[in-house]
Amino acid sequence: MKAFKAYDIRGEWGSDLNADIAYRIGYFLPDILVADTFLVGRDMRVSSDTMFDALTRGLTDRGKDVDSIGLATTPLVYWSTAKYGYKASVQITASHNPKDHNGLKISAANALPVGYDTGLNRLEALVASDTPTKPCANKGQIRERNVYADYLAFQKQFVGDLSNLNIAVDCSNGMSSLFAHELIGKAHYINDTLDGNFPNHEPNPLEANAQEQIKALVKKEKCDIGLLFDGDADRITFIDEKGRFISPDLIIAFLGDFFIGEQKQKGIVLQDIRSSRAIQEYLDRYHAKVETWRVGRAYAALKLRELDGCYGGELAGHYYFRDFYYSDSALLAASIVLRLLAERKKAGQTMSQIIDEITPYSNSGEINFKIERKQEAMDAVRDHFTQIEKPERFLDFDGYRLDYPDWWLNIRPSNTEPYLRFLCEAKSQSKLQELIGTVKGIVKHFACLFIAVMLIGLASCQDPAKSRIYMDEGNKLMMTYGKFAEAEEAFDKAIQYDKNNYEAYYLRGCAKINEKKYKDAIADLEKAIELKPDYADAYFNIGRAYFLLHDEEKACEYYKLADHYGRPNLEDYLRKCQ
C-alpha cells in the first residue's frame, strides 16, 4: 500500500488513504501494539476529523478505549505517551506534506517510534488483507483528556529571559500556533492561526519558497532571529539576523552550549550521517563525543535512547532530547536556541557570528541525481576516492560517508524515489567545487543510462509547441506565485519536449537560484549559453550565483561577460569588480 512509508503512514487523502483504510488501521492496530487504551491526537488538516472518527471507530470496535487529547502537536503526543504511561499512541498528521495529504505517526510505550521494520509492515499486511472486520460485543469508549497545562508547565522550564531579543516567528498555519505565543512571548508572528489549507506557503521549513516570508520579516523588523516551524511542530529551521537560512545541523552544535556547557549533562550527542564535521569540532571544547547514525526519527529516537545520549539532531530540522523522552520537539529546540542567543547578545554576538564561529566549512547542500542504478553509482563513487586515499573514517549504514582531513562526502539512496542524494563539505570553496564536479562525472554515466531509457520514444516526439506551454506555466509559477520548485518541474517538462530550448534552461537556472541550489543553477545557465552563446542574461545570473556562493572573482568574470554581450544597468555590479 502506497501510504505505508519507512517511518510512518502518509499519503494523499482520498486515494492513498481514506476513511475505510483509516478504520482498518484502527481495527488491526491492536494486533501490532498490545494496549487497552490508545492515546490519539490530531492536527488541523481538513481531513483530520474524518480520519479521527474512522480510526477511533476501528479501535473501539476492537474493544479498545481511546483517550483523545484533541488538537495536538506531534511532540505533545510523544510527550503524553511517555509521561502518562500509555502503551500505544497515534498522531493524525501529514507533517510538512501538502494540504491534500494526511497520515499517522504511531508510537509504542515510552514514545518509541513504530516504523516499517518495527510493525508497520505487519500492519500493512493486515489492512491490505481480506480479513473481515467485526465489531466486538464490548465496544471501547472515547474519552477526552486535557494535557495542555501539564505540557506547558514542562516546556516553560526551558524558557529563558528573552526580553532583549527581537524575534520573528512563522508558524506555517500549523500546530505550533497552539503554544508559540505562550512559550516565546513577545515577537513578530505570521501565519499563526490554524488553517489546514496552508494558505500562505507549504508547511515545509526546508523549502526555499516557504522561507521567503520569514526572511522578509526578519529583515523588515530588524530581528535578531527568525523561527520557521513545520506543519506538526516536530521540525524547525532558523534564520539569522541577515535573513539567511541556517543549516539545521549546525544548531546541533549550538545546543551543546546549553545541555553540556550550562547544564553539565553527560552523554553522547547524536547526529545523522549528513551532518557537518563542525559539530564534533565545536563540541570538542566540552570533550563531548558525537555519534553518527541513520537518517529518520524511527532510527534516531531509538539510537539516542540506546546510547542514553543527552540530545541529538538531523539535517532535516529534527532535534531530540533525553529530557523529552528521547523524542523530538521543535518548540523545545526553539526555547533553548532563543535562551542561548539572548545570553550571547548581551556579550555583543549576533546569530550569524555564532554560526560563523561554529563552522569553517563550505557546504554543497543536498544534490539529487535521478537514477535507477543507485547502488552501482554509490559503489563507483566510493571506489574512486578510496583507491586514491584511504579515508580517516568510512561509514556504510546509510549509503556511504567518507571523511578525509579537509573534506567529507555522503552519498545515499532515497528509499522511495529513483534519486541518489549527495552532499559534501570542504574547508575551501575550490575543493568543494572539485568534489562536486568529480562526483557528477562519476554518477553521470549511470544517470545517463537511466535517462536514455526514459527518453526512448521522446527523441522522436520533440514538440516545441508543448515545450512553450510548459515554459509559460513555469514562468507563471515562478514570477506570479513564487513557487520555484513547481516551476522547476514545469521547466523540466519544457526541456523534455525541446532539448534545444535555451530559455527553459535559463529559467530553470533562475528558479534554482531562488531555491539556493546555486551550483545546479550554474549548470543550467551554462547549458543555456552553450545553446545561445551571446545570452547576456544567462551570464549575469551565473555571476549572481557565484556571488551568492561567495566567489566574487568568478562573479565579476561573468558580470563582465554579461556587460560585453549588452546586458544594461550593470554599473553597481561592475563597481564591485574594480
Predicted regions and their residues:
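Canonical tetratricopeptide repeat
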Residues: 507, 541, 573-575
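Helix-start (N-cap) detector for alpha-helical repeat units in TPR-like alpha-solenoids
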Residues: 466-468, 502-503, 536-537, 569-571
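Gly/Ser/Thr-enriched, mixed-charge loops and adjacent short helices
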Residues: 102-221
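An N-terminal, well-structured beta->alpha segment
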Residues: 1-57, 61-63, 142-164
